Amino acid sequence: FDLPAAAVAGQKLALQVTVTRPRPLRSRMNLTFDSKNLLTGRKERITVLLAPDMALTETFMVPLDTACCGHYVLDLASAGTVDALGLFGIPFPNVSLNGSATVYPPMIDIDILPARGRMASESGASYDHDRRGQDRSEVFEMRDFRDGDSFKQVHWKLSARFGDLTVREASLPTDYDIALLRDAHARSDDGDGREDAVNAVMTMLSALSLALLRQGLAHTVVCKDAEGAHVQRIDSLAGFEDMMDTMLSMPLEADRPHDPDAFNQVRIAYGITKTMLVTDALHKDALDELAGMTDLSVVHIGKTAQAGADDGGRYLLTHIPAEAVCGGRIKTLEL
């Protein structure tokens, strides 16, 4: 047996089965595999009937389901040979398979503007004096407008005063610790839409983490586990890759949202001031409680949600359809 180590959701992944026989016999082979996605908890039993020709060695490809991302574990439940009529069977001795493969979500590039919100704590904030960033609450430098600059960067009062467009460059915070919260749910009541939502949440989580790394911003990724919260610090590409492998192996959250007390312990331990929650379910009471602890931005992934943002409450809420995320149509987010 040969199973590739990785694939991307929706792409082909196949288990290679090589059959070697001492004599060319036309007996058929019956194989049964048990597959489990550790992320979603979904189990599947796969039964394969092979009909080898007369060659001593033959290879077969068994396609596997990659509709949903996650870490898949594959075991051989039974294997044997059966006669042409399927009446008599003989099990194979000493044949086993304990394989696994990681199916990654679609990878997309997103530019994010992590601005310090009105609920953020300003105490102890410091900024890089040599590099510009995306925190528009602190000015890095003032300069003349250049082609390609966003009009959001224009300082209109100074521009009117001096007669030329003046741009306000944002600063790069050096102790502005950001947390990404995974909040995808393993509910089965949405049918096929559940796979799309899970893929979209994991795609968005990976895109935000990579976008922060590109800006030189180390950050923390948090998800629920049996003990309350699993925390990983991301400050390099190697750390990002390890985080993705871990997140795709950890079971999705139950219907209950993040435990505010568990998150508060993480927030204090890691000095978190900005939190980006990626979720497929909105729990208003829990979000209000989180917003009281941290500067909170929420990315809500919905099956049929209309794209848009709401900044009227205690946190910034952005709605994005799942198919828009996996389709790579989201290019910029202000969080």
Task: Describe the function of each predicted region.
Residues 1-230:
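An amphipathic, basic-hydrophobic helix/alpha-beta surface used to engage anionic
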Residues 48, 124, 147-335:
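Exposed, interaction-prone extracellular/peripheral surfaces
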